UniProtKB/Swiss-Prot annotation:
Pfam families: NMN_transporter (PF04973). The keyword Membrane applies. The keyword Cell membrane applies. It comes from the Bacteria. The chain crosses the membrane at residues 15-35, 38-58, 107-129, 136-158, 171-193. It comes from Streptomyces davaonensis (strain DSM 101723 / JCM 4913 / KCC S-0913 / 768). This is Riboflavin/roseoflavin transporter RibM.
Length: 213
């Protein structure tokens, strides 16, 4: 899969390689499918991870390892949405707000995970080009995917927090194309957040006996 590491084009003085372009496109498709609560969200997410794993394997083992974790969480998400019993009236996953206990657990996991992963990255510099923000984005992505798999509206808030670091970080390091992709991510996140928020309120309303759902 050497072609994945070859240059696709140059934009904003940034050399875009095929794996970045394909990965970013699949990432945008994943968010759009997630907004619609489509089961295809997870196969596309898995494919995105697989493409990047193939691009990184052999010379960037740390990046390949991160994509392996993403693929594992994508399989979990597919299982949850496909086999889960908590379905909305349309047969898709039912969305809800997390409980305070769930929120606390996710915040704690994100904090501890970020510190642990950042220390790992610092101990092995070849795993990351910028340990702390890279760890924050990686762990935040995993937490967001977990919340999405459980149908939690907070999934969108987690993605927004990732974007708040990802956008300025990419622009500051000269990755304008990647930064603009994160801006598009942010727009999709706000759109999806509004939809899931309103849907969670509808799904939580009790249906009167004999009334159409």
């Amino acid at each position: 899969m050497n072609w994945l590491n070859s240059e696709a084009f140059v934009l904003f003085d940034q050399h875009i390689i095929w794996s970045d372009m394909v990965g970013n496109i699949l990432g945008l498709i994943t968010l759009a499918l997630g907004f619609r609560r489509s089961l295809w969200t997870w196969p596309v997410q898995f494919l995105s991870g697989l493409v990047l794993f193939g691009a990184f394997y052999g010379h960037l083992t740390g990046s390949a390892g991160k994509q392996a974790v993403v693929m594992a969480v994508a399989l979990y998400g597919w299982y949850q949405w496909n086999r889960g019993t908590d379905k909305a009236a349309d047969g898709k996953v039912s969305v809800r707000f997390a409980t305070w206990a769930e929120r606390g657990a996710m915040i704690a996991a994100a904090a501890v995970g970020t510190v642990a992963v950042a220390l790992l990255f610092k101990a092995y510099p070849s795993l990351s080009w910028d340990p702390w923000p890279d760890a924050y984005i990686f762990v935040g992505t995993i937490v967001a995917m977990y919340a999405q798999a459980r149908g939690m509206v907070e999934f969108w808030f987690a993605w927004l927090l990732v974007d708040l670091v990802g956008v300025p970080l990419n622009f500051a390091n000269g990755y304008a194309f990647s930064g603009f992709v994160y801006v598009i991510y942010g727009a999709l996140v706000l759109w999806g957040m509004r939809d899931w928020w309103l849907r969670s309120r509808r799904d939580s309303r009790p249906v009167l006996e004999g009334a159409p759902a």
